[in-house]
Amino acid sequence: MDNRPVGTRQARELLRVAFGPSVVALVVIAALTLLQLLIANSDMTGALGAIASMWLGVHQVPVSIGGRELGVMPLLPVLLMVWGTARTTAAATSPQSSWFVTRWVVASALGGPVLIAAISLAVIHDASSVLTELQTPNALRAVGGVLAVHAIGATIGVGARIGRRTLTASPLPTWLPDAFRAAAAGVLALVGLSGVVMVGSLVVHWSTMHDLYAITDSVFGQFSLTVLSVLYAPNVMVGTAAVAVGSSAHVGLATFSSFTVFGGDIPALPVLAAVPSPPLGPVWVALLIVAAASAVAVGQQCARRPLPLMPALGKLIVAAATAALAMSLLGFAGGGRLGNFGDVGVDQATFAPAVFLWFVGIGALTLAMSGGIARRPKRATPAPVPEPEPDMVEDEPEVLDDEAEVDEAEVGEAEPEPVDNVAVPVDGEPPAEEEYPEDPEDHFVVDDDGTRDGNGEAAE
């Protein structure tokens, strides 16, 4: 995307970010609402109010009908809305985008849904004059819910594009993306394994689920129950995750945990057949394996890039805290008040701490066993310097010799060596005879036998 927020292409992208996911949700909700009214042979009075209420319900805004509050909204639509917002904002943001363009993208992702929320509130207020049982929700609660959902999606989308660049320019540690990736892996593992447990429990309680489907005789009614069960399946998975980590989930007075179950009335929703019934069998204690396996996934993700001890532990703690915060947020969004049944949700006082302790404890053990802690290289000890011995000094005599040679050269220049007197021949005189060394035989004494005279000549 170009850094200039003007032009046809930029305006089209910003419009897609602002209204794309919200308009798609409105179209789907309108189609389902009109289909329901047509099948029920009902008139279209208040259809717009129902559509607006359902759109706000996607953003976890409670709906009040006839004095009864429906605060437990399905998690699947809100998760799809977060995913759609993250996808559109990521597509409109490039890794090289300036902060000016990024601010425009985030503002569009928040401004468009808030505008639709204001219109929906006005439509509901107008429809409540016709449908007296429909009540207008709190405006602050409605706008806050819409802002929260789209802010989470925009943060995920923009962070995926420029998060690493922002982190490089900040003083924060460089292992933060790895910690967030490990937290996402832990959350997906915990929720996914809880879903497997939920499906297994539905198979075990198949007869109970069949009885819940029997409350309606029409095919369309059973189809509607199936759709509702699919929409509320993530809520049940989050409750199963709370039970798996040692916390508890409750539907009104009915409370469920891995150690005990207190019975009570539950809504006639087929997916709720997965909840255990008292007395609790010992097999449910095996749910703790789900928490341990999810913690192993966190530790393995943190061990992908080994770090020294303290940074490795810091990365694991950040990952565990992020995962605990995400699960707590899912538990809060998936709960609420359900009419006469009372409050539905998880125990928030123990859910997030339990997730954190599982991920830190088992995750640290996995981190150490998987080689995620890098050992610091040992510092090479310098070799000891040998002390100089008196008889092994080699350089000093050479320096002295050089100095002696320099002194001798200076003395030689100052005092030239004496030259022997050489006799110079004078004109007219014969050259002097060369001096030869004396013959040693001249000094020998030989006995005279009379054959030679004193001059060395033979006698006659």
Which residues make up each language-model segment?
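Alpha-helical transmembrane segments of integral membrane proteins, especially early/N-terminal helices
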Residues: 26-42, 68-73, 100-119, 145-156, ...
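Hydrophobic alpha-helical transmembrane segments and immediately flanking/interface helices
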Residues: 94, 135, 139-143, 205-227, ...
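Membrane helical hairpin/interfacial module
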Residues: 62-110
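Hydrophobic alpha-helical transmembrane segments of integral membrane proteins
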Residues: 96-132, 185-197, 267-287, 309-342
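Long, glycine/tryptophan/cysteine-rich extracytoplasmic
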Residues: 2-83, 124-131, 215-287, 332-357, ...
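Cytoplasmic membrane-interface segments at the C-terminal ends of transmembrane helices
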Residues: 2-14, 83-103, 122, 153-183, ...
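Alpha-helical transmembrane segments and their membrane-interface junctions
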Residues: 192-208
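Alpha-helical transmembrane segments and their helix-start/interface "positive-inside/aromatic belt" motifs
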Residues: 6-31, 95-110, 138-144, 174-191, ...
